[in-house]
């Protein structure tokens, strides 16, 4: 069963769930991709979650070029969040790419932004979180991401569809 179908089934089972402590759900597809979502609320149309991870075993040990290709493909395709996203930093030593909202959402009280970390270390990971930085306060706080079920399905599909394919020899 693909990840989109699995997440749909999980959301149906969690309908009505709401908690300050996230419920971690995890799904695996036939290609070994592992999707994890830290859910804090689900209703009939939408959900809120702290983070979304996708472990991609085929990316383990890949050079930053594959991650850069994934970052570019994601940034071009995922245009339906509150802000557009784009790669802002490539760390070739640690094989990581940082993607953020471009530009972030700025208000008089602070700034909110999405942050995605792509990593080819240990288990090849995509990690999505949203942060808020208060004006005049140091640091940032993680805030929940709110999406309709349909938007979450599209995001999961786009993540899977843009994974770089290993080079064939």
Residue ranges of each PLM-predicted region?
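Phosphate/adenylate-binding glycine loop and adjacent helical scaffold
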Residues: 68, 86-93
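Short, hydrophobic/proline-enriched secondary-structure or compact coil segments at domain edges
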Residues: 93-106
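Short, structured motif recognition centered on aromatic/hydrophobic residues
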Residues: 34-40, 113-122, 126-128, 155-156
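Conserved short hydrophobic interaction patches
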Residues: 73, 77-84, 154, 158-162
């Amino acid at each position: 069963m693909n990840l989109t179908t699995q997440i749909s089934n999980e959301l149906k089972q969690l309908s009505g769930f709401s908690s300050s402590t996230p419920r971690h759900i995890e799904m695996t597809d036939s290609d070994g991709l592992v999707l994890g979502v830290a859910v804090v609320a689900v209703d009939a149309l939408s959900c809120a979650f702290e983070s979304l991870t996708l472990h991609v075993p085929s990316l383990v040990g890949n050079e930053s070029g594959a991650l850069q290709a994934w970052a570019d493909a994601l940034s071009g395709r995922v245009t339906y969040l509150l802000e557009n996203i784009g790669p802002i930093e490539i760390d070739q030593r640690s094989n990581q790419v940082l993607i953020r909202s471009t530009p972030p959402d700025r208000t008089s009280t602070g700034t909110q932004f999405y942050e995605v970390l792509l990593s080819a270390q240990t288990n090849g990971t995509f990690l999505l979180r949203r942060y808020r930085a208060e004006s005049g306060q140091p640091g940032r706080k993680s805030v929940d991401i709110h999406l309709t079920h349909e938007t979450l399905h599209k995001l999961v599909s786009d993540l899977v569809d843009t994974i770089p394919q290993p080079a064939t020899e």
